[in-house]
């Protein structure tokens, strides 16, 4: 396990370096307005002096080296437009908690409803619970997410009597965005578990359990479901982190002061330093999720040996 993790972490660091460096280079191709709050009022001499003080006139390899040197010391620079001269790390620390809270609640909701739904659909293959559940899941997956997000907001805010401006102190404002964020993962868990249970229903270990007189409920819960949880658990950390990262549209829709809305605002206002910091954070979050998934798989099923698996690739 440890050699595999060492290789995985090494590859992850390389991936992180490539992603963030590529974004860093792409941002350097954009207009320089993103580094000045009052660009329209500045003279050319002032602009050049400002770029020089920020090191943006240095050769690109030098700029990349300085960025990573500062990033390794926890310095991601300062915002030039979103909050003038405010440290990027401080802004991220203020915005990240609410996105994580939303992601945790959405993940719990998708697990609480998705797993039982998948179990029921798998046990009732071909009957009305399976057909109804499949129809709902296909609808969720087929309709563009933006469409049902808008409908949920349009009718949900009226039904619950909430306004369009998010109020973190009122639990009612959390219900609609959390439900919206949970739908995609709920559909995935339910359909995946249903398919797994149907595929496993004729395996030898299931037939042996039936021959021993084990009830269908016992087979589903103690045999099939236990095996299904191994690959499912690997997906949970990355799904949670993807929920946090992918909440951009929902946070903007409900005016939630989280990471998603922050990214949209900074891109629209060309705050390049903030965009760099957000991309670095998102890349770290995604990579950590993938590694945690592998670790959880081994903790749940010690029979898994990544060392042998890695060697056979």
Model-identified regions with their sequence ranges:
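Cytoplasmic-entry segments and transmembrane alpha-helices of multi-pass inner-membrane transporters
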Residues: 2-9, 117-153
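Transmembrane alpha-helix signature in integral membrane proteins
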Residues: 9, 16-17, 21, 89-120, ...
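Hydrophobic alpha-helical transmembrane segments of membrane transport/permease proteins
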Residues: 16-65, 156, 160-173
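Hydrophobic alpha-helical transmembrane segments of polytopic membrane proteins
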Residues: 19, 106-114, 177-188, 260-298
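An internal, D/E-rich "acidic patch" concept
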Residues: 56-115
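Generic hydrophobic transmembrane alpha-helix motif, especially the helices
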Residues: 109, 133-187, 264-266, 272
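Membrane-cytosol interface at the C-terminal ends of specific transmembrane alpha-helices
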Residues: 170-210
């Amino acid at each position: 396990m440890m050699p595999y993790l060492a290789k995985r972490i090494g590859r992850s660091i390389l991936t992180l370096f490539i992603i963030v460096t590529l974004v860093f280079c792409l941002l350097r191709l954009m207009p320089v307005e993103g580094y000045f709050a009052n660009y329209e009022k500045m003279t050319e001499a002032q602009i050049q002096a400002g770029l020089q003080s920020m090191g943006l006139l240095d050769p690109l390899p030098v700029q990349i080296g300085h960025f990573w040197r500062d990033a390794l010391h926890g310095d991601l620079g300062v915002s030039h437009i979103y909050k003038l001269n405010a440290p990027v790390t401080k802004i991220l620390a203020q915005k990240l908690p609410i996105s994580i809270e939303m992601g945790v609640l959405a993940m719990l909701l998708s697990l609480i409803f998705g797993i039982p739904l998948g179990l029921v659909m798998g046990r009732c293959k071909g009957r009305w619970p399976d057909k109804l559940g499949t129809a709902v899941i296909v609808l969720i997956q087929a309709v563009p997410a933006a469409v049902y997000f808008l409908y949920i907001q349009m009718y949900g805010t009226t039904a619950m009597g909430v306004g369009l401006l998010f109020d973190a102190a009122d639990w009612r404002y959390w219900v609609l965005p959390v439900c919206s964020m949970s739908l995609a993962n709920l559909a995935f868990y339910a359909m995946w578990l249903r398919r797994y249970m149907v595929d496993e229903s004729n395996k030898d270990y299931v037939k042996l359990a039936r021959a021993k007189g084990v009830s269908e409920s016992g087979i589903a819960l103690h045999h099939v479901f236990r095996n299904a949880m191994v690959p499912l658990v690997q997906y949970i950390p990355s799904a949670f982190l993807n929920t946090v990262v992918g909440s951009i549209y929902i946070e903007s829709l409900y005016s939630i002061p989280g990471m998603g809305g922050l990214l949209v605002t900074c891109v629209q206002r060309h705050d390049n330093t903030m965009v760099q910091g957000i991309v670095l954070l998102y890349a770290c979050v995604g990579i950590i999720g993938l590694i945690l998934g592998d670790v959880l798989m081994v903790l749940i099923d010690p029979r898994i040996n990544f060392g042998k698996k890695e060697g056979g690739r």
